[in-house]
A protein has these predicted regions:
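Generic low-complexity, intrinsically disordered sequence content enriched
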Residues: 14-16, 26, 113, 148
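Hydrophobic membrane-insertion alpha-helices, especially the h-region
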Residues: 8-21
């Protein structure tokens, strides 16, 4: 009897796991989301922590400050992803060529559309056009664009610098992500019509950066 119970329990667990997987896929319906998060990645941190040898195109050649990591459809809590079935969506080469100036590589562009862009309900052309418009609407504080030495700052100080440079933003529209004790990203939230909007729980500041002070590596040593 105990063996039958054990087998039955395993079957129920397997069925539950399948149900969760299906639910997650169904939750990822294209076009079903509340707002976008524009993720601006601080390239010097990525290169210092993930690619110190300069193997990727992002970390060799001309130094970069903020690059576009992604433009993510979000729910107020949680997010959809990979809203397609079958083969990975095809991105036209002209779209890739247009985005390569603000995103650090072809692989990232393809990955971001497959994982996040498909959930926008937009074609690659329309999705990346929206991402570029959001990206270009944000002014990077002058000090960060030309940072020549490591800066020590609190997340709140970095946020205030962005608010000062972008009067259209409010405090609840911007979050700072860090780790380990370095600036990783600045995230700005946009409505579906590409207007700045309040962020949901996904951009909870206390969760994204627990450090009281963080280092901002320089663009140029």
């Amino acid at each position: 009897v105990s063996a039958r119970v054990a087998v039955g329990a395993l079957a129920l667990a397997a069925a539950a796991a399948v149900a969760v997987a299906l639910l997650r896929f169904e939750d990822g319906a294209a076009g079903d989301f509340d707002y976008y998060t524009l993720a601006l990645s601080w390239s010097p941190t990525y290169c210092a922590t993930e690619d110190p040898g300069g193997r990727t195109s992002q970390c060799r050649g001309r130094p970069r400050a903020f690059v576009l990591h992604g433009f993510w459809p979000q729910h107020e809590r949680g997010w959809p992803e990979s809203c397609y079935s079958g083969n990975r969506p095809w991105i036209p080469q002209p779209v890739i060529d247009d985005m390569i100036g603000i995103m650090p590589g072809k692989g990232l562009i393809i990955h971001q559309y497959a994982k996040h862009g498909t959930c926008s309900g937009l074609s690659p052309e329309a999705y990346f056009d929206a991402a570029r418009k959001a990206y270009e609407s944000i002014r990077v504080p002058e000090r960060l664009r030309r940072l020549s030495r490591t800066l020590s700052a609190t997340p709140a100080e970095i946020e205030r610098a962005f608010l000062s440079a972008n009067p259209q933003l409010r405090e609840d529209m911007v979050s700072i992500a860090c780790g380990p004790e370095r600036l990783r990203e600045v995230r700005v939230c946009f409505s579906r019509s590409l207007e700045p909007t309040a962020c949901g729980d996904n951009e909870n500041q206390a969760r994204l950066c627990r450090s009281r002070r963080i280092r901002v590596p320089p663009v140029v040593d």
